[in-house]
Amino acid sequence: MSATAFTLEKIEPIERETIKRVAWRLIPLLMLGYFCAYLDRSNVGMAATTMVVDLHFSNAVFGFGAGLFFLGYFLFEIPSNLILNKIGARRWIARILITWGIIASLTGFVWSEWSFYWNRIFLGLAEAGFYPGVVLYMTWWFPSYYRTRFMSIFQSASVVSLFVGPPIGGLLLYMDGVAGLHGWQWLYIMEGLPPIIMCFVTYVLLTDRPKDAAWLTEEQRTWLQARLDSELEQRESIRKFSLGQAFLTPKMWLLTGAYFGQTSGGYGLTFFMPLIVKGLGVPTGWIGLVTALPFLCAFVAMIYWGWHSDRVGERMWHLVSSYALMAGGMAVCIVIGTGHPVITMVALCLAVAGNQCISPLFWSIPSAMLTGTAAAGGIAMINAIGNLGGWLGPSLYGVMKDATGSTDISLLCLAVLPVLGAISLMVAGHDPRQERMMRRG
């Protein structure tokens, strides 16, 4: 996270100093938690390169099992976010971190298809609520004008994890035979330790609400709360949703479909990227490093695109272009094939950049619509159902790969999904009054 990322426009000193202090206090802490979460996403693909051989898993078994994480995630997502809204982020996020850390480490001891399946379900149950909880938490601290840029910075932790995770995972695979364990077992055991540590850090350092922030001056607390209250009043004057209305309004379901299109294509690509890179003829020792390159490109793209969207006060076409880049990058991979590995890697960089740019922009739309309990439940609903795409994408890719033996056909199935997501997003639309509210700051 660079200093330039936190540079604020020419504004009143109280606003500039308050936002800067809140950002530097909260965002690094949340980023570390999200970094830990994404170690699983980055390393489950690395583990697959040897785990599937040692446990005699097919691509379909691995893809199905990897995606079962999102079944557990789906089942507990809404209750988890409602609990967070009730008891506070500090205690609940700390609980999430320690339980998923323990279960992530236990993945190193699965021995069969069914033990792998159940482990992934319980891991999803444990982690449920972290990401939508942070989306909700951002609305408690950041005015809408700043929210997308800081969501982009927060979410860049996932890209950093996907960038550094594969090389670290590749090194851990070389521990094969140490203490009688396979390399993939060491990979899973070690990835569970950081979230356990972060549990205690979060419990001590995270602050629930601005009124609890002893690290802000009285003047800063007063200004921030007044600004947030003013935005809440403006938003509710457009329309105030109850929890039930948030679950039933057609726009929320269209947004859920849009998010599903991104997650299904994105997770399918992420989980199987090490195997795609291996198919380009990359030596085993270099797979982790080469797999990390698209995420380095995505890191730069998502921070710039989130900042640009906030700066110009526009969401919809920033989002649609990101969906198009994601689908287009995969389409180029299909057309080029494995015969031109450099061009294929460039296309993968574009696809991953498009995928990673979507989420921080996307969440600005429901968080601008909803308030209070409706925000807690509605954001969790979109994330819970949308993230079932994390089950569909890897499963679809694995099944198609086993059935046809073709990477191109498998990628084609994934590329269609963000196209459908973009269509759903455009049908849902975005209230221009919320855009004007952002531009007024």
Regions found by a protein language model. Give the residues of each.
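Helix-breaking motifs and short loop linkers at transmembrane-helix boundaries and internal kinks
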Residues: 56, 88, 109-115, 126, ...
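Conserved MFS/SLC helix-loop-helix module at the cytosolic interface between two early adjacent transmembrane helices
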Residues: 75-114
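Glycine-rich segments within core transmembrane alpha-helices of 12-TM secondary carriers
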Residues: 149-173, 194-195, 383-393
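C-terminal transmembrane helical hairpin of 12-TM major facilitator-type secondary transporters
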Residues: 315-365
